[in-house]
Swiss-Prot record:
Gene: ampC
Remaining remarks: The class C beta-lactamase family has a specific amino-acid numbering system known as SANC, for structural alignment-based numbering of class C beta-lactamases, or else the simpler name structural position. A multiple sequence alignment was used to derive a consensus sequence and then the consensus was numbered taking into account insertions and deletions. This allows use of identical numbers, e.g. for active site residues, despite differences in protein length.
GO BP field: antibiotic catabolic process; response to antibiotic
Residues of the active site: S79 (acyl-ester intermediate), Y164 (proton acceptor)
InterPro entries: Bact_CellWall_Synth/Modif, Beta-lactam-related, Beta-lactam/transpept-like, Beta-lactam_class-C_AS
Record carries keyword Hydrolase: yes
The organism's place on the tree of life at top rank: Bacteria
Keywords, ordered alphabetically: Antibiotic resistance, Hydrolase, Periplasm, Signal
Species, as recorded: Serratia marcescens
Protein name: Beta-lactamase
Chief localisation class: periplasm
Length: 376
């Protein structure tokens, strides 16, 4: 090592701990009041700037045991799982197993001759199939699910409305796994996740990892974990830790090495809502950056999830928006998640909590953290 290189290494060794401490103070100022406001037992905040990752753990994984949150603590990520399912479909497409242009009925013989002759995989991947949000309560097995799909009739033409849908992304996950000739969980855990280098991300948490699985808490402080049900794995089934999830965001920023089959990421513009709040990509939502906090809150509020919004296809699809705020919320009964990355800034933030609290507060917290990161 030359004298100049030794000096550079010494300077870096002195600067990095100071920068980390300053970043910790910025994040403390945002997260500690938020945890107090909602009585959140534990959180993990993962930050990446130019590929340099830091994990900031807060509180406990279980109020009963008092075990602290660490970077290995597993959280339910809720609907952030939908982005993994969309990525699995891209993973299958890269192997020439499917095409997003094809109708869903091309891959599912049980729904041929139904409304799905006119619903493309791209519609399923962008919440524009018209399918409703929830699987009906009386649908409890695959036969009943397929019967529901066969009988379903859309209220609007495919592509004309954005309707946030577990049923839509669930069908896409079924098709992606079928095209790979594997059960969904196997395709995810043994195929795509290893290709991403995510070794502590699961649909089914193995026995050896249960000690790392945080206890979730409902808004009224009851201990809860996600319940099994039709399309749960495809829609909201992922459990992961802060280290794996910030790697996932960095992969979207192309800041980490992944297997060659996993080098294209599902961020391409495909549909925009006429309300103008955001552009809908393959499960990720994006906003031109810089963006006002009020616009982010509008796009992530409950109304955008529960109510349909007119949508217009962008044709041809545009290149990815580098100056964009890409985000996705995720919730289960006892966990809260918010993920955001900004390609033009090479910044990513992942927020994980073992208690449910509103999206607005998650978005605002991440917004202030990113503002602080940009000032450093």
């Amino acid at each position: 090592m030359t004298k100049m290189n030794r000096c550079a290494a010494l300077i870096a060794a002195l600067i990095l701990p100071t920068a980390h401490a300053a970043q910790q103070q910025d994040i403390d100022a945002v997260i500690q009041p938020l945890m107090k406001k909602y009585g959140v037992p534990g959180m993990a905040i993962a930050v990446s700037v130019d590929g340099k990752q830091q994990i900031y753990p807060y509180g406990v994984a279980s109020k009963q045991t008092g075990k602290p949150i660490t970077e290995q603590t597993l959280f339910e990520v809720g609907s952030l799982s939908k982005t993994f399912t969309a990525t699995l479909a891209v993973y299958a497409q890269q192997q020439s197993k499917l095409s997003f242009k094809d109708p869903a009925s091309h891959y599912l013989p049980d729904v041929r001759g139904s409304a799905f002759d006119g619903v493309s995989l791209l519609n399923l991947a962008t919440h524009t199939s018209g399918l409703p949000l929830f699987v009906p309560d009386d649908v409890t097995n695959n036969a009943q699910l397929m019967a529901y799909y066969r009988a379903w009739q859309p209220k609007h033409p495919a592509g004309s409305y954005r309707v946030y849908s577990n049923l839509g992304i669930g069908m896409l996950g079924m098709i992606a796994a079928k095209s790979l000739d594997q059960p969904f969980i196997q395709a995810m855990e043994q195929g795509m996740l290893p290709a991403l280098g995510m070794s502590h991300t699961y649909v089914q948490v193995p026995a050896a990892q249960m000690a790392n699985y945080a206890q979730g808490y409902s808004k009224d402080d009851k201990p809860v974990r996600v319940n099994p049900g039709p399309l749960d794995a495809e829609s909201y089934g992922i459990k992961s830790n802060a280290r794996d999830l910030i790697r996932y965001l960095d992969a979207n920023l192309q800041q980490v090495k992944v297997a060659s089959v996993a080098r294209r990421w599902p961020r391409r513009t495909s549909v925009i809502t006429s309300a103008g709040a955001f552009t809908q990509d393959l499960m990720w939502e994006n906003y031109p950056y810089p963006v006002k906090l009020s616009r982010l809150i509008e796009g992530n509020n409950a109304g955008m999830i529960m109510n349909g919004t007119p949508a217009t296809a962008i044709t041809p699809p545009q290149p990815e928006l580098r100056a964009g705020w890409y985000n996705k919320t995720g919730s289960t009964g006892g966990f809260s998640t918010y993920a955001v990355f900004i390609p033009a800034k090479n910044i990513a933030v992942e927020m994980l909590a073992n208690k449910w609290f509103p999206n607005d507060d998650r978005v605002e917290a991440a917004y202030h953290i990113i503002q602080a990161l940009e000032k450093r």
